[in-house]
Amino acid sequence: MHWRIGLIGYGEVGRIFAQDLRAKGLQVCVHDTKANALNAQSAELMDHAHRHGVQWKTSHAQVCANSDLVVCAVTASQTLAAAQACAPHLLSQAFFLDLNSASPGTKKAAATDINQNGARYVEAAVMTSVPPYRTQVPMLLGGAFAAQASTALNQLGWHTRVASDQLGVASATKMSRSIMIKGMEAMVIESLCTARHHGVEDAVIASLYETFPGVDWEKQASYFFQRVIEHGRRRSEEMHEVAVTVSEAGLTPWLATATAQRQSHMADLADAGVFGNKADAGFARNPDWRIEADRLLHSVSTNQHKPST
């Protein structure tokens, strides 16, 4: 298969996919609006692309005009805007793979824009963390073109399966799961920071081991802190989409909304440097959650970064 592949978004997922696709000898190009800022972050992204042989494009249109498959991996709040920016420029019959964590309603709206311009929209739901699996991360696909896309992607070594030929099923699965996963992250951070403040964290951890003996709570807690410190903003935006999904079911999204707030607050702290310099190699990689909890507690105790209410 000699697909030309375009990436919209060059965050963690985009960079991982680019590296793996280039390793297979495929032509890859990318556009990320963050590069428009011309700052250290944009320079780092473009340097990464250059080192891996990824062609940097200056617009959505340039990516779409040169791609048989466009993989969209932006933040949740930009899902529809990214699809609309790409739609007029996609090649006829090109696949548009929407990896974004968005509600079924948002995915359906994006599909309308893509399909009416002659391309093929495929809803995708990434079902676990990407870094351990890379392009083999388990992925659910949905929509009228899901079966065609799944066959082609699996030939590239991806791990996809069709959830439904109807749009919304894959994303509903992902969004419902996120209530649990992102909610657990928020609960663990809030629970253990509270316990740490009161000096009872060891007792709480011991109780968790007794109740859920199959989980390494020390390791899991540190991993949750790491992921939220690094990706809290993205997770917060996803949880706002989850809240929309919950509302579509006729329920009040109390948990989804609270989780979004906790994730957003962690992102604010990270942006303010509470957890260290983002440019440092060790940022969000601390193996001991207690160190990050102490940083958080010190910040809020001095009224430096109290969450808004």
PLM segments and residue spans:
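Rossmann-fold dinucleotide-binding core
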Residues: A102, K107-K182
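Short, well-ordered alpha-helix to beta-strand connector turns
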Residues: G25, N66-S67, Q93, V137, ...
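Rossmann-fold NAD(P) dinucleotide-binding segment
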Residues: H60-Y121
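NAD(P)-dependent dehydrogenase/reductase Rossmann-like domain
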Residues: M266-T309
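Helical "substrate-binding/catalytic lid" subdomain
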Residues: T173-A279
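NAD(P)+-binding Rossmann beta1-loop-alpha1 motif at the extreme N-terminus of oxidoreductases
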Residues: M1-A65
